[in-house]
């Protein structure tokens, strides 16, 4: 355990400087986390929530997250790892449509940013941060809690809590978002998992299993296809190849928020489940990562609070392709 932690804690320094970090572990899972920091954090872009960035995670010799990209820059929109989240309102930041050039709008989990004179929101760009808010990090041996407070920004303000905890074979992400401003917070939020099961390339050994029969809305160009409830790859993706589509077929029940990603070559599996209905799924993958992006919707009136939970249960793939997996108790605790 001590040897492993020493290796994990050295990982953030690979970015070239001292990066704030932490480690959590239980008897089965070991994970390294990057911590939010406006001056020296590993990720300082404005697309994704800064909390809960998982630098690496190991379960019974299998690895699940890591650096999937070739070029690192702390302000790149996607220079990030692990199951991270993005909040969107009308496919933009909160308050973006109301703000005039030179005024502020909100990126939840990032802070208040400046709106330039532009025709439309540039999701993959990095905006100037004018108020990063206040971050507090609380820690235990098998959990870390992030608290982000943002004061009034054009009528929007919040206290956002996100706790990562390990229970048995499961990483649980618990969220609470309290609206402390004058305006309603209406947003969607999705998990961008950046799965890297055992660092293997995306190809026929990888299968993504849904709780429903998925329908791809875009052409998969001979690279992948749906078979029943499975999304499968027909060939190993080359470095410049991408599979991207929206997925339809889910219903209005949280039961459909149940997605498994498996590598049949190495035996690594992960089951992602949520306690809210899915509102949208975007599927994106390249050679180095597989990302089924499940969205949920939030609407929080002033003075009110909303909570939601995502669980990642890690398991060994059995020989039977449809072997049953009992949902971890961590999902219900």
Question: Language-model segments: what does each one mean?
Answer:
Residues 18-172, 180-186, 192-333:
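Surface-exposed acidic/polar loop and edge beta-strand patches at domain peripheries
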Residues 3-12:
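Sec-dependent N-terminal signal peptides
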């Amino acid at each position: 355990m001590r040897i492993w932690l020493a290796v994990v804690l050295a990982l953030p320094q690979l970015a070239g400087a001292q990066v704030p970090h932490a480690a959590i572990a239980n008897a089965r899972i070991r994970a390294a986390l990057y911590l939010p920091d406006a001056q020296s954090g590993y990720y300082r872009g404005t697309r994704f929530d800064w909390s809960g960035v998982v630098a690496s995670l190991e379960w019974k010799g299998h690895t699940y997250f890591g650096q999937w990209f070739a070029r690192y820059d702390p302000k790149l929109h996607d220079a990030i790892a692990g199951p991270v989240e993005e909040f969107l309102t009308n496919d933009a930041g909160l308050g973006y449509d109301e703000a005039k050039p030179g005024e502020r709008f909100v990126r939840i989990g990032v802070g208040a940013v400046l709106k330039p004179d532009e025709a439309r929101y540039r999701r993959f760009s990095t905006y100037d941060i004018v108020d990063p808010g206040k971050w507090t990090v609380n820690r235990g041996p098998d959990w870390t809690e992030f608290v982000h407070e943002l004061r009034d920004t054009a009528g929007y303000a919040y206290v956002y809590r996100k706790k990562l905890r390990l229970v048995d074979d499961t990483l649980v992400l618990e969220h609470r978002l309290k609206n402390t401003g004058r305006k309603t917070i209406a947003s969607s939020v999705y998990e961008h998992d950046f799965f890297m099961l055992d660092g293997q390339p995306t190809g026929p050994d990888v299968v993504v299993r849904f709780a429903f029969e998925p329908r791809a809305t875009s052409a998969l160009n001979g690279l992948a296809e749906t078979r029943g409830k499975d999304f499968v790859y027909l060939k190993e993706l080359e470095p410049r190849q991408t599979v991207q589509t929206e997925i339809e077929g889910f219903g209005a029940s949280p039961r459909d928020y149940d997605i498994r990603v498996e590598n049949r070559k190495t035996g690594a599996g992960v089951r992602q489940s949520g306690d809210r209905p899915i509102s949208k799924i975007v599927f994106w993958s390249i050679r180095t990562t597989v990302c089924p992006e499940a969205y949920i919707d939030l609407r929080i009136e002033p003075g009110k609070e909303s909570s939601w939970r995502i669980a990642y249960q890690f398991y060994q793939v059995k020989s039977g392709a449809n072997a049953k997996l009992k949902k971890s108790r961590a999902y219900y605790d």
